[in-house]
């Protein structure tokens, strides 16, 4: 991911890393109780590029796969200082410094071994489900900026989503990160509006949004209906953040 997103001229890899770090922070906060962070989530972040698929965690978690959220919260690589603008109560804004934990750093490695990444996720989740057969079905969020160049991702996706717990099948949601302009296509129920075979293949790979996720998406003003899939094409930065939020925050509604 060495290209940029639209007019913002930000490296796509940096945008993805920033969004993932923000998501991990928010998930950890949601799981925080008086006695500490509860392990409502196990998290794995896989980076794929060039010829490799590997854990994208850095620091103390480097090389870790599925990791309890309490350990994720405890071991960021570092904590950066960010500046946010907040209302000053008098009609203006003030700059406020805030901590920003970093677990994942931006990387750009050329090729797109998506099949390898999906197969790695399948292996990780197969082992996790064997130990947690009654758990909530795992969710895989696949963020990609290019077509797979290591095989047929539809076949790999089907093997992944055939895994199931007692509560249902693994969910696979796909988001295409674009450097082109234009409105994203979000959570479509069919492929008629998609521009090409690549977009249609990502749509076919994607799971339908469960009812509670459709409800949450609708509350965020998305046009969703029965059959809508966890798929966003030609994503911009706003859609990326909202996609990650819907893919995880909806779990709290159950």
Residue ranges of model-derived segments:
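Acidic, low-complexity intrinsically disordered regions
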Residues: 1-254
């Amino acid at each position: 991911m060495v290209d940029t997103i639209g007019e913002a001229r930000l490296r796509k890899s940096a945008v993805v890393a920033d969004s993932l770090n923000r998501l991990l922070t928010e998930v950890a906060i949601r799981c925080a109780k008086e006695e500490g962070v509860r392990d409502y989530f196990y998290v794995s972040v896989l980076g794929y590029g060039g010829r490799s698929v590997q854990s994208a965690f850095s620091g103390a978690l480097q090389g870790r796969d599925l990791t309890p959220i309490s350990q994720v919260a405890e071991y960021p690589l570092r904590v950066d200082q960010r500046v946010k603008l907040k209302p000053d109560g008098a009609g203006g804004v003030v700059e406020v410094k805030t901590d920003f934990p970093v677990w994942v750093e931006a990387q750009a490695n050329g090729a797109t071994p998506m099949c390898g990444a999906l197969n790695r996720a399948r292996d990780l989740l197969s082992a996790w489900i064997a130990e947690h057969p009654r758990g909530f079905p795992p969710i895989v969020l696949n963020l990609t900026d290019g077509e797979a160049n290591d095989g047929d991702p539809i076949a790999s996706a089907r093997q992944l989503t055939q895994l199931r717990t007692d509560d249902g099948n693994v969910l696979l949601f796909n988001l295409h990160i674009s450097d082109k302009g234009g409105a994203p296509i979000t959570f479509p129920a069919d492929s008629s509006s998609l521009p090409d075979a690549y977009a249609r293949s990502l749509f076919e790979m994607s799971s339908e949004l469960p009812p509670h996720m459709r409800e949450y998406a609708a509350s965020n003003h998305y046009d969703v209906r029965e059959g809508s899939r966890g798929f966003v094409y030609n994503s911009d930065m706003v859609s990326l953040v909202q996609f990650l939020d819907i893919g995880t925050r909806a779990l709290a509604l159950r």
